[in-house]
From Swiss-Prot:
Positions of the DNA-binding region: 17-36
Originating organism: Bacillus subtilis (strain 168)
Gene3D superfamilies: lambda repressor-like DNA-binding domains
SUPFAM superfamilies: lambda repressor-like DNA-binding domains
Pfam hit, one: HTH_3
Function statement: Transcriptional repressor for the ans operon coding for L-asparaginase and L-aspartase. NH4(+) may influence this repression.
Cited PROSITE patterns: HTH_CROC1 (PS50943)
GO MF term set: DNA binding
Protein's name in the database: HTH-type transcriptional regulator AnsR
Length: 116
């Protein structure tokens, strides 16, 4: 995790450790542990941090934004050619939502791999 980035984002907003922890609904010591590297946030906490600081989990983890690679494009083309629809709450997923779903799963797997 990019610890400097987490501290930088908090200080940019002029928030104290306590105020930030309160916004997240966690103990000050827990949040301070994230910034110092003593603790690692769960996936849920990482998502909350990204939302709080209006950034992405990838950015908090210090990852570069990646372009869609050829295998991803091929996978999506293959996916689009299949003759079925995936829906959530009775509404079919759009192509953008499918891309977001694939990206989410890949990111989750990478984060879990890094944390283990």
């Amino acid at each position: 995790m990019n610890l400097d980035r987490l501290t930088e984002l908090r200080k940019k907003k002029n928030w104290s450790l306590q105020y930030t922890a309160d916004l997240l609904g966690i103990a000050k010591s827990t949040y301070a542990g994230y910034e110092s590297g003593y603790r690692r946030p769960s996936l849920e906490a990482l998502a909350m941090l990204a939302d709080l600081f209006d950034t992405t989990c990838d950015e908090l983890l210090g990852r570069e934004k990646q372009k869609q690679t050829a295998p991803q494009a091929i996978e999506l083309a293959t996916w689009s050619s299949l003759d079925f629809t995936i829906s959530v709450d009775g509404q079919p997923l759009s192509e953008d939502e499918i891309i977001q779903l694939i990206t989410f799963i890949r990111t989750k797997r990478k984060v879990q791999e890094e944390l283990s």
